[in-house]
């Protein structure tokens, strides 16, 4: 019987499948549940956005990662709604304390004219593969980074995020 390599914040990978990180982090990101997302983060993350024209951080602190993703110029924009859907997935065990998840991903985004979310301004969706890194930290599996590779975008994806993804110059961490 195949062993599940799905990392979990609640169980060891040897005890069986769990939805805690492989599914819940996407629910948290899409629902903007920042506290719950923060709880599954490793102390430092590898963040490589070079394949989507942005920067790479070999060791970004969890606090800096949270500041980046929750920033008003990125996913913290109250006028942006998003849902990240995971498709096909396979797991690569690097060591007893490190796993790489290879995920097919569709990220749907809708931007509204105001935070009341009544009038849609634009849509932008991305189809990608994503490497997600997981490490065991303090005996618990944690999300330790990502490396997306966009296959193609729909609609006006490049206009969804007013800061992080629409400006050509390098952005510094908040």
Curated annotation (Swiss-Prot):
| Any Pfam family matching the protein | Scytalone_dh
Keywords attached to this entry: Lyase
Q: What organism is recorded for this protein?
A: Metarhizium majus (strain ARSEF 297)
One Gene Ontology MF term: lyase activity
Q: What is its EC number?
A: 4.2.1.-
Residues that coordinate or bind substrate: 49, 130
- What is the name attached to this protein's record? Scytalone dehydratase-like protein Arp1
Give the family this protein belongs to, as stated in its UniProt record.
Belongs to the scytalone dehydratase family.
**Which SUPFAM superfamilies does the record cross-reference, listed alphabetically?**
NTF2-like (SSF54427)
